[in-house]
A protein has these predicted regions:
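Extreme N-terminal tail/first-helix region
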Residues: 33-53
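Divalent metal-dependent catalytic cores for phosphoryl transfer on phosphate-bearing substrates
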Residues: 47-52, 60, 69, 74-183
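Classical nucleotidyltransferase
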Residues: 1-37
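Exposed alpha-helical structural elements
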Residues: 3, 12, 20, 41-48, ...
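General structural signal for secondary-structure boundaries
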Residues: 1-2, 41-42, 96, 112
């Protein structure tokens, strides 16, 4: 399934496949398991990230990435880091509840009962862990991804940029978004 292929990319497919099948896949580098996604140049990172999304989500991810880069330029933050955070911010969003919880277990991510009941919130935490461990991203990018859904007090400029970019990117349609985009 698509989810199994995604979990192979996150190096967390043990519960989806027979151990001998998984060993064969990894030994032969099938389904991209032999690829190194750490510290990729941006265009390759973009390709890798978008390959993990549902096609309907791709315009949002690209819009968030471009909006984050634009906001970084406007507010004097690192544009490259903002773009990297934007392209990876929803990298685990397509995963099911069981896959999200499996990633939480793999990465030692503590979850609340509320998060387990509303598992779509977990993608920010699992996405940050994947950004760190699979893509080799720096702490600033990972932290921005971690907080892009809930926010927190005393956010860094990059964290604020990603939070806002996700909220106001061009695919978002709600009353007041156009005014927000002009600020």
């Amino acid at each position: 399934s698509t989810e199994t292929r995604r979990m192979l990319r996150f190096r967390c497919a043990e519960q989806y496949l027979d151990p001998k099948v998984l060993e064969y896949i990894e030994a032969h580098g099938l389904y991209g398991t032999g690829e190194n996604w750490r510290s990729l140049p941006f265009e390759k990172l973009k390709q890798a990230s978008l390959s993990l999304h549902d096609p309907k989500r791709v315009p949002h991810v690209i819009g968030c990435c471009e909006t984050a880069a634009r906001l970084a330029r406007r507010w004097g933050a690192d544009e490259a880091l903002a773009a990297r955070a934007g392209i990876l911010h929803d990298v685990t969003k397509a995963l099911s509840k069981s896959a999200q919880l499996l990633l939480c277990e793999k990465y030692g991510i503590m979850t609340s009962e509320f998060e387990r009941e509303n598992y779509k919130l977990l993608h920010s935490k699992t996405g940050a862990a994947a950004a760190r461990d699979v893509f080799g991203e720096c702490d600033a990018v990972c932290s921005a991804i971690y907080w892009h859904t809930t926010g927190k007090a005393d956010m860094t400029v990059l964290e604020k940029i990603l939070y806002l970019a996700d909220y106001m990117e061009p695919c978002r349609k709600f009353d007041g978004v156009e005014k927000l985009r002009t600020l």
